[in-house]
Amino acid sequence: MSKFDALNNQWNVPLEVSIEQLNLSVSELKDIQLSNEGLIQAIKGVFSKGFNALRVGVNKLLETEQKQLTINEAYANKLTNNALKSNYAYLMDRMVSVPAGMNTTYVNYTAHSLKMSEMFKNTMGMVEQLRSDIGRVISTEDGIKDSTIFSDAIYIKTSKELKKELDVLNKLRKGDEYNAVREYGKVFKNNNELIQSNEIARKTNTNINSIDRKKLTMSVETTMEYVKELSALAQSTGFSRQLIVKIGNAVACVAELVEAFSASVFNQEMIVKALDNVNEEISGLV
């Protein structure tokens, strides 16, 4: 039997739906009018949907596990300030590749991707923190009944920071498109911005490549097992309702972070591919 079968999770639920379901179960758990039977069902909902949210997040991560991001330096290195200094007017109206959905300049878009990658460097730490915090609840006698043994504050803080940056990203994007192109002059305010965009993208690549995605995947899977064990413990020995609410909040936050990191790898891959196309084309013209 697959380890995912134990909590009867649905396999084809998008993460945003899974997180929404988890948050709904957490809200239900706060309802002081619940009967004992209703309370048990709410507890099962928190753990099964929390488990599922982590599973969906790790499945997204598996899609990006092997990708190492790098700019094609053979083209990028040809684009020096000296080579580009007198060609901007000639290039302004030329149509060049952009990442699908980009609705700003390359410098703005790559700079935000870099900022996101700085945030994601702590993804492993957050997953391991959650695993450690849940492990402490499990290993402490009657820990499952102690509302003070677990704090969700750091997870909620990270989630708020993530959502703030995702809101910024949404403002820099429009609906996804295929074969996205823009006028050179609209995505680069001067030729130096092409060089600058390459430099920013290199830093982002380094940040993303520095995260061991295989190790992160294994850490999420171990945390999932802890969630399953905690669920069984809660149903067999009793629990603190407030504690389970905090754990549910933390699991939702970590699942969102893992999924957002996975999406950022894909987004950076699109940036690199588009920049490679621009670098190849422009290096052949100057």
Show the residue positions of the predicted features:
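Long, low-complexity or tandemly repetitive, helically biased scaffold regions used
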Residues: 73-286
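Leu/Val/Ala/Ile-rich N-terminal alpha-helices, chiefly Sec-type signal peptides and the beginnings
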Residues: 1-107, 113, 117-120, 134
